[in-house]
């Protein structure tokens, strides 16, 4: 069924806006996946703030012009779903990687971050990135450790002085 020109322009504008705000994109071939499974995937994507787009390849190629995701142009072949991560760069990668494990027909084609197209084998690289919350927690732990050590050292100084004074006192008492 043909799409009207106005509808095509709206689709291109929507995908362009999404691509402009996204941190990463993952491309996958969705052939053989049922509509029920796709609906479940979309629900999970909404929860993770990942935007899924299924558009014609020609419209997608036009939509990504002028964005950092122009590099995905060669991968736009055959039925393709685009998963844009809006807050966490690894969210779309984790989501589609888990979905691909469940559904053998679902095949990841590639991913792009920072204007670089990577193959599907690189999905783990992006999927294992910590979330913002996890990264901040690790940073807090790493920065807290030296401060805690310093506090313990400073708290230990009066105790050491007391022990030295007591030892000197004991020596003088033994000598007397």
UniProtKB/Swiss-Prot annotation:
Name of the protein in question: Large ribosomal subunit protein uL10
GO MF annotation: an example: large ribosomal subunit rRNA binding
UniProt keywords, alphabetically: Ribonucleoprotein, Ribosomal protein, RNA-binding, rRNA-binding
Assembly, per entry: Part of the ribosomal stalk of the 50S ribosomal subunit. The N-terminus interacts with L11 and the large rRNA to form the base of the stalk. The C-terminus forms an elongated spine to which L12 dimers bind in a sequential fashion forming a multimeric L10(L12)X complex.
Function comment: Forms part of the ribosomal stalk, playing a central role in the interaction of the ribosome with GTP-bound translation factors.
Recorded family membership: Belongs to the universal ribosomal protein uL10 family.
Gene: rplJ
Signal peptide location: none
């Amino acid at each position: 069924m043909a799409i009207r020109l106005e509808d095509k322009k709206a689709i291109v504008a929507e995908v362009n806006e999404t691509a402009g705000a996204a941190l990463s994109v993952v491309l996958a071939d969705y052939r053989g996946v049922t509509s029920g499974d796709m609906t479940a995937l979309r629900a999970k994507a909404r929860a993770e703030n990942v935007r899924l787009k299924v558009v014609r390849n020609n419209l997608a190629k036009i939509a990504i012009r002028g964005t950092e995701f122009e590099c995905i142009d060669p991968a736009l072949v055959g039925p393709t779903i685009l998963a844009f991560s809006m807050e966490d760069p690894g969210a779309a990668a984790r989501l589609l990687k888990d979905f691909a494990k469940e559904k053998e027909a679902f095949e990841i084609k590639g991913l792009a971050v920072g204007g670089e197209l990577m193959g599907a084998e690189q999905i783990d690289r992006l999927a294992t990135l910590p979330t913002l919350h996890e990264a901040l927690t690790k940073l807090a732990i790493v920065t807290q450790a030296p401060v805690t050590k310093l506090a313990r050292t400073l708290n230990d100084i009066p105790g050491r002085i007391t022990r030295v004074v007591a030892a000197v006192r004991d020596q003088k008492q033994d000598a007397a």
